[in-house]
Amino acid sequence: MAEVPELASEMMAYYSGNEDDLFFEADGPKQMKCSFQDLDLCPLDGGIQLRISDHHYSKGFRQAASVVVAMDKLRKMLVPCPQTFQENDLSTFFPFIFEEEPIFFDTWDNEAYVHDAPVRSLNCTLRDSQQKSLVMSGPYELKALHLQGQDMEQQVVFSMSFVQGEESNDKIPVALGLKEKNLYLSCVLKDDKPTLQLESVDPKNYPKKKMEKRFVFNKIEINNKLEFESAQFPNWYISTSQAENMPVFLGGTKGGQDITDFTMQFVSS
């Protein structure tokens, strides 16, 4: 009668007598590990294999058969690792390794997001409703007067930049700089009165999308005419006088003696 050979004492040291165990410890005999890893030599659809031996051992048939059954179970449980491990295979493991967590901001820094935003600008000239043009009067002042012929070259060319502000259907925030000059119209408080001035700026920092509020004007179009309301001082407007050759100023009245309506002429770059 054929008998199942008993395992050598080296292997039996790792054997478990419990039929439900996997029978061998992780650090078992090296030759057994190799036989499990080389699955090409052990097809998964194979059954229990018995070896015939002429030698007799003191161990019982039941123990030896249990070990063989355990080996067969292990063969079928092990899955060979593919030869090439692709990078996209890592995505399979990420949900088990990392846990997604939302990021909350206590404050929202608009400056960080608009600092590098491009600024859209156009070049233009302005005339009040009486067709007076705006020209330089000294280094930091504008005045309004009628120009004709070659004198039209004296009128100021503005670089109108579309900036961040309280934009609505009838109001567009803009900044008014003088073309090729480091000067911008700004509104400040002098002697407790809102005042229009020309302010010198650093050309490395201006224009920018988020201008300081004193530089911002709300451009309002009414009946093909334009008004420029100060964002710093609501209901105060860029104004001219009825008289000739008078300074451009910031006025707090509309429809009276002060002129707050302008027309805009585009100028090629």
Swiss-Prot record:
Species assigned in the record: Homo sapiens
A single GO BP: positive regulation of JNK cascade
Function: Potent pro-inflammatory cytokine. Initially discovered as the major endogenous pyrogen, induces prostaglandin synthesis, neutrophil influx and activation, T-cell activation and cytokine production, B-cell activation and antibody production, and fibroblast proliferation and collagen production. Promotes Th17 differentiation of T-cells. Synergizes with IL12/interleukin-12 to induce IFNG synthesis from T-helper 1 (Th1) cells. Plays a role in angiogenesis by inducing VEGF production synergistically with TNF and IL6.
Induction of expression: By LPS. Transcription and translation induced by M.tuberculosis and a number of different M.tuberculosis components in macrophages; EsxA is the most potent activator tested (at protein level). In pancreatic islets, release is increased by high glucose treatment. In pancreatic islets and macrophages, release is also increased by endocannabinoid anandamide/AEA.
Motif Involved in interaction with TMED10 C-terminus per record, residues: 228-241
Xref: Pfam families: IL1, IL1_propep
Keywords: Cytokine, Cytoplasm, Inflammatory response, Lysosome, Mitogen, Pyrogen, Secreted
Gene transcribed to yield this protein: IL1B
UniProt cross-references to InterPro entries, sorted A to Z: IL-1_CS, IL-1_fam, IL-1_propep, IL1/FGF
Impact noted for substituting residue 190 to E: Suppression of integrin binding. Markedly reduced activity. Markedly reduced activity
Entry comment describing in which tissues the protein is expressed: Expressed in activated monocytes/macrophages (at protein level).
Domain of life: Eukaryota
Effect on the protein of changing residue 221 to K: Enhanced integrin binding
Pro-peptide region(s): 1-116
Other remarks in the entry: The IL1B production occurs in 2 steps, each being controlled by different stimuli. First, inflammatory signals, such as LPS, stimulate the synthesis and promote the accumulation of cytosolic stores of pro-IL1B (priming). Then additional signals are required for inflammasome assembly, leading to CASP1 activation, pro-IL1B processing and eventually secretion of the active cytokine. IL1B processing and secretion are temporarily associated.
Description of post-translational modifications: Activation of the IL1B precursor involves a CASP1-catalyzed proteolytic cleavage. Processing and secretion are temporarily associated. (Microbial infection) Cleavage by S.pyogenes cysteine protease SpeB promotes its activation independently of CASP1.
Residues the record marks as site: (Microbial infection) Cleavage: 105-106, 115-116
Effect upon mutating residue 204 to E: Suppression of integrin binding. Markedly reduced activity. Markedly reduced activity
SUBUNIT field: Monomer. In its precursor form, weakly interacts with full-length MEFV; the mature cytokine does not interact at all. Interacts with integrins ITGAV:ITGBV and ITGA5:ITGB1; integrin-binding is required for IL1B signaling. Interacts with cargo receptor TMED10; the interaction is direct and is required for the secretion of IL1B mature form. Interacts with HSP90AB1; the interaction facilitates cargo translocation into the ERGIC. Interacts with HSP90B1; the interaction facilitates cargo translocation into the ERGIC.
Molecular function per GO: cytokine activity; integrin binding; interleukin-1 receptor binding; protein domain specific binding
Consequence recorded when altering residue 244 to K: Increased affinity for integrin ITGAV:ITGB3. Suppression of integrin binding. Suppression of integrin binding
Name of protein: Interleukin-1 beta
GO cellular component: cytosol; extracellular region; extracellular space; lysosome; secretory granule
Regulation affecting activity: (Microbial infection) Cleavage by S.pyogenes cysteine protease SpeB promotes its activation independently of CASP1. SpeB-mediated maturation of IL1B plays a dual role depending on infection site: while IL1B inflammatory response prevents bacterial growth during invasive skin infections, it promotes streptococcal infection of the nasopharynx by disrupting colonization resistance mediated by the microbiota.
Gene3D superfamilies with a match to the protein in the record: 2.80.10.50
Family: Belongs to the IL-1 family.
Annotated positions for site Involved in receptor binding: 120
Compartment(s): Cytoplasm, Cytosol; Secreted; Lysosome; Secreted, Extracellular exosome
